[in-house]
Amino acid sequence: MTPSTGSPTPSTGSSRPGVPTGLTVHRAGDRFRTATRWLDSRHSFSAGAHYDPANTHFGLLLLHNEDVVVPGRGYDEHPHRDTEIVTWVLDGELEHRDSGSGELRRVPAGGVQWLGAGRGVRHSEHATPSGDGVRFVQMWVVPDEPGGDPGHAVRDVAGPLAAGEPVVLASGLARHADSTVLPLRQSMAALTVVRLGPGAVTGLPAAPFVHAFVARGSATPEVPERPGPDVPELGAGDAARIVDDGGRRLTAGRDGAEILVWEMHSGLGAGP
């Protein structure tokens, strides 16, 4: 897969030798795809049968899938370990059950779920049998340390999201330690969602790695080094990956935008 780029010429000022700074656009159509009778999944990084050695992760983000699942179907029980899993539900309702509590939990649209796999957990995820199925974005990050007890939590943020301000969904950053956001056992990462009206502007965090995914609508990133018509617009399913160049802004298009933003203050090894 070859990403389309909306980035300036790589800067020589990166603190990671060989890693270009600036903004790179990865288009929705460049994602890997897995399609079955019950699932349509788009993978931003290598996943399952799809492998690109140049696109295995970004920062601490190991997986970023957008899944559409038909009613009553889904992922049967399967194992995870040493992974922090965050799921954002866009449409419909997701049913989740794990081996920790055995309790069936439902996550509605506008809801976020965290599953800390710890030393090992088994879980299942299905669309509710009624309705039109479910669409969600699932994201994995590496934890600070392996092992530990599995954990699970759900939060509905549909109300705060409607206000148009950024809502922190899950975080391990010290500045969020006393807040009501879902925990993340990765002290260098946080996930935020913002729903913007037409023409509204939001700032992106100043962090070594920023991943901004447009889940709905469209948005145009601030690219001072490429002013005018050459600035790339991000449509639904597109993502901006930004390295060592934080503090940019995004302006929503005429239909508004819903954007998921990862702020990461570390990466895996020396690479992106």
Go through each PLM region and give its residues.
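Jelly-roll (double-stranded beta-helix
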Residues: 1-272
